[in-house]
Design a protein with these regions (language model features):
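Residue-level recognition of single "structural anchor" positions
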Residues: 1-191
């Protein structure tokens, strides 16, 4: 906006982003490319209101983001909610690789038992390097912020951060399969 000669304080921009980012994320979900069937699932930590909260994330074997969810607790219920949401969006995976997290293990076994399916569970920290490295893109943006004040604003801003990260990775389904830059993909969502 400053390039066009319009000077705006940072607080209205922050308020606009809190309103617009959830809508942008919803529009992106409708146009997201399908992901692979071998997922890597992990959680990372984000500081909200001086306390650590848990950002569940999953990527496929190629490094494409499957889904993300910010929760207050790293328990079985939160991991299962994340997993069911990812399955509803992308279908059942064949394999899920996790670290030694007990909550993730319990959630996957619970989904296997309830849905009468057999998702192969692998616990290998070296295969999980893809998702660990993918956390860096989110941390690169959130660490300079020095944490969030409120949980609801953290959820909304992380939706925007993750959406922009997935757009940069090229996961938006483009019309006519034409090659588009990240800025062109963003404009196609926004307008």
């Amino acid at each position: 906006m400053q390039e066009r000669g319009v000077f705006v304080d940072h607080s209205p921009v922050h308020r606009w982003s809190l309103k617009i980012l959830p809508l942008l994320s919803l529009m992106f979900r409708r146009r997201k490319r399908p992901v692979g069937t071998s997922w890597r699932m992990d959680e990372t930590y984000i500081k909200v209101g001086g306390q650590w909260k848990y950002l569940y994330r999953a990527v496929d074997k190629a490094g494409d983001t499957v889904d993300f969810l910010l929760t207050a607790k790293p328990d079985k219920a939160a991991a299962r909610r994340f997993l069911e949401r990812a399955i509803n969006l992308h279908g059942l995976p064949e394999k899920i690789t996790i670290d030694k997290s007990g909550a993730n293990t319990a959630a996957i076994q619970s989904v296997n038992d309830d849905a009468c399916v057999n998702i192969e569970l692998r616990q290998c920290k070296y295969l999980n390097n893809i998702v660990e490295q993918d956390h860096r893109a989110v941390k690169r943006v959130t660490n300079p912020m020095l944490g969030f004040k409120a949980f609801w604003s953290a959820q909304r801003l992380i939706k925007g951060i993750e959406t922009m990260h997935v757009i940069k990775k090229g996961q938006l389904r483009c019309p006519d399969e034409q090659a588009m830059s990240a800025a062109e993909q963003f404009y196609s969502l926004a307008f």
